[in-house]
UniProtKB/Swiss-Prot annotation:
Organism: Rhizobium johnstonii (strain DSM 114642 / LMG 32736 / 3841) (Rhizobium leguminosarum bv. viciae)
Name of the protein in its database record: NAD(P)H dehydrogenase (quinone)
Cofactor: FMN
Residues of the signal peptide: none
Binding annotation for NAD(+): 12
UniProt record similarity statement: Belongs to the WrbA family.
GO-annotated molecular function: flavin adenine dinucleotide binding; FMN binding; NAD binding; NADH:ubiquinone reductase (non-electrogenic) activity; NADP binding; NADPH dehydrogenase (quinone) activity
Listed GO CC annotations: membrane
Reactions listed under catalytic activity: a quinone + NADH + H(+) = a quinol + NAD(+); a quinone + NADPH + H(+) = a quinol + NADP(+)
Positions of FMN binding: 10-15, 78-80, 113-119, 134
EC code(s) of this entry: 1.6.5.2
Binding site residues for substrate: 98
Note accompanying the cofactor annotation: Binds 1 FMN per monomer.
């Protein structure tokens, strides 16, 4: 049974919702799944004043525990076309794991969100993939076998690089059913691949 970590950062709850959908998909494929988040870097008073969702139930991850999993599925919103600094900061602390080769051969995957359809989702996912490759990890996305990412009948996130959601500039749009299905598919896809690699 593959051990999968869904590791996320979510300021307003959209990525948190996607993370649990990813976890559901991974569990459906037989994986042992853990959902954790990275630490918040914004001072608590500023976060509350900015209406961040500060009451998230997932425990905080530690860098060293990354080595305990067969696959790590990372989720974070895009910030100006790249991954949120909270997630970047967490992975910037993995030098010891890199030096010891602790993540070599493990599977990595990414999902994200943005306020607009062209708000940097693909650049965020593609920009994170080198982190996995430097660690010696194998990368998986969201294959076109998930047909939900096809078509133009509605506004929706998702690409072959990974699941995603569009939130609107005011954060009022929650992940749609098709976006959550994409997240579940990605979780299941990664879990199946991780079981083969483990």
């Amino acid at each position: 049974m593959a051990k999968v970590l869904v590791l996320y950062y979510s300021a307003y709850g959209h990525i948190e919702t996607m993370a649990y959908a990813v976890a559901e998909g991974a569990k459906s494929a037989g994986a042992e799944v853990t959902v954790k988040r990275v630490p918040e870097l914004v001072p608590e008073d500023v976060a509350k004043a900015s209406y961040y969702k500060v009451d998230q139930a997932a425990p905080i991850a530690t860098v060293d525990e990354l080595a305990d999993y067969d696959a790590i599925i990372v989720g974070a919103g895009t910030r100006f076309g790249t991954v949120a600094s909270q997630m970047r900061n967490f992975w910037d602390q993995t030098g010891g794991l890199w030096f010891a080769g602790k993540l070599v051969g493990k599977l990595g995957s990414v999902f994200t969100s943005s306020a607009t359809q062209h708000g940097g989702q693909e650049s965020t996912i593609l920009g994170f993939i080198p982190t996995f490759l430097h660690q010696g990890m194998v990368v998986a996305g969201l294959p076109y076998a998930f047909q939900g990412q096809m078509g133009t009948e509605e506004v929706k996130g998702g690409s072959p690089y990974g699941a995603s959601t569009i939130t609107n500039g005011d954060g009022s749009r929650q992940p749609s059913e098709i976006e959550l299905e994409g997240a579940k598919y990605q979780g299941a896809h990664v879990a199946k691949l991780a079981a083969k690699l483990a």
